[in-house]
């Protein structure tokens, strides 16, 4: 009986993954470019539509000095917008699949049932899937940047020198993009990469050169993002400086707490419920569930 179940899982998993990809593509197809996408389709400082890579470079230079420091995410956004909605739908679908696979690689669970499970969690536990995965500006900032972040973390968490040819070279741009991703995860992955280096020093008395290079480039990306002149220009336009430091801290904490309750808490509640159900199933079947999914 168990062998039949394993065989069924082998056949069903790729079908479910393909169905998930089709659904993700279709949702992308139904959601058109909107809101900030319309502005980022221009050179930003004028209503002129972007036509080529040169326009994007000029737009991002203006953006960096006048609006904000997320240059990597917004340059990628403009490239996707330039490609058009048809290609954006395909790229977004491919990035969703890749993100799920990267999660499986980091977890060292590289079989199709795990891939489908990862995709299910990316969609099912997403606090606001429309605005973070299917709205193009949100996808560029969170879906695509999450891919770069996981790729960078994979190098540090699953390091095997023989499987990472040329890493001394390509870890530099990868670290720069990861650090330059967004104001929360950029510093977080830098700290995690630093922790890995410290642990390797404790265990092996040294760390590979590429780890230092990646850490430094990640830190450089984070600094370039946070210290962007546009951040201060935009902050001045919002009138935040009119409030005292203590009041600004209160407003920020209130906004964070509200965001946690509205977006993060439901996802955390669902995660806890799923873990309890899975734990119960494992206890009931005496590890049979793990045997089945590990086909």
Please place each PLM-identified region on the residue numbering.
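Transmembrane signal-anchor helices characteristic of membrane glycosylation enzymes that use polyprenol
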Residues: 8-35, 39, 218-229
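Short hydrophobic/aromatic helix or loop-helix immediately within or flanking a transmembrane segment
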Residues: 62-86, 90
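Transmembrane-helix motifs of polytopic, lipid-linked glycan transferases
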Residues: 90-113, 151
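Membrane-interface micro-motifs in multi-pass membrane enzymes
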Residues: 118-157, 182, 295
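Membrane-interface alpha helices of multi-pass inner-membrane proteins
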Residues: 167-189
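Perimembrane helix-loop-helix junctions
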Residues: 188-216
């Amino acid at each position: 009986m168990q062998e039949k179940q394993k065989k069924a899982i082998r056949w069903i998993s790729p079908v479910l993954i393909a169905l998930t990809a089709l659904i993700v593509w279709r949702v992308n197809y139904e959601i058109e470019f909107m809101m900030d996408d319309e502005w980022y389709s221009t050179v930003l400082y004028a209503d002129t539509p972007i036509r080529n890579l040169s326009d994007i470079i000029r737009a991002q230079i203006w953006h960096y000095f006048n609006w904000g420091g997320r240059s990597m995410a917004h340059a990628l956004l403009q490239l996707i917008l330039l490609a058009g909605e048809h290609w954006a739908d395909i790229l977004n679908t491919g990035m969703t699949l890749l993100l799920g696979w990267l999660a499986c690689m980091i977890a060292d669970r590289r079989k199709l049932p795990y891939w489908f499970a990862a995709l299910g969690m990316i969609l099912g536990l997403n606090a606001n899937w429309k605005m973070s995965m299917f709205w193009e500006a949100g996808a560029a900032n969170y879906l695509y940047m999450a891919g770069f972040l996981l790729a960078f973390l994979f190098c540090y968490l699953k390091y095997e020198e023989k499987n990472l040819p040329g890493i001394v070279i390509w870890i530099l741009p990868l670290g720069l993009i990861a650090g330059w991703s967004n104001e929360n995860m950029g510093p977080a992955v830098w700290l995690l990469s630093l922790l890995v280096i410290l642990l390797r020093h404790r265990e092996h008395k040294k760390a590979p050169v590429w780890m230092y290079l990646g850490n430094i480039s990640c830190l450089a990306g984070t600094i370039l993002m946070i210290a962007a002149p546009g951040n201060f220009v935009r902050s001045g336009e919002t009138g935040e400086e009119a409030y005292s430091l203590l009041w600004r801290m209160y407003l920020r904490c209130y906004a964070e707490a509200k965001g946690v309750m509205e977006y993060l808490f439901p996802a955390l509640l669902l995660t806890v419920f799923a873990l309890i159900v899975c734990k119960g199933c494992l206890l009931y079947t005496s590890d049979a569930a793990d045997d089945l999914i590990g086909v």
